[in-house]
Amino acid sequence: MFVAGQVTIAGEVSVYESSEHGRRHFCPKCGTGLFYTSEAVFPGKIDVQSATLDNPDAFPLGAQIQTADRIGWMAGLADLPEFPRYPGME
């Protein structure tokens, strides 16, 4: 989460009203989700999708959110084998 006034957005952004209070902001050319806003849930902040940041490593994770709806097996992801890309394509 970032304070809305401290984030610079470059380029055109489209908005989809996904609920009464929620807004999903995305690239109008390719459809990539960029960030989510909800003045009712977290006023003055934006929930940026980490893969869209220029330098995501500069912002380490501080918490997990929406865990009430998490798929059961997601809690054990750290215990699974890891592959840089796809299995067998090292």
Task: List the predicted regions and their residue ranges.
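A short Gly-Trp-Pro
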Residues: 1-90
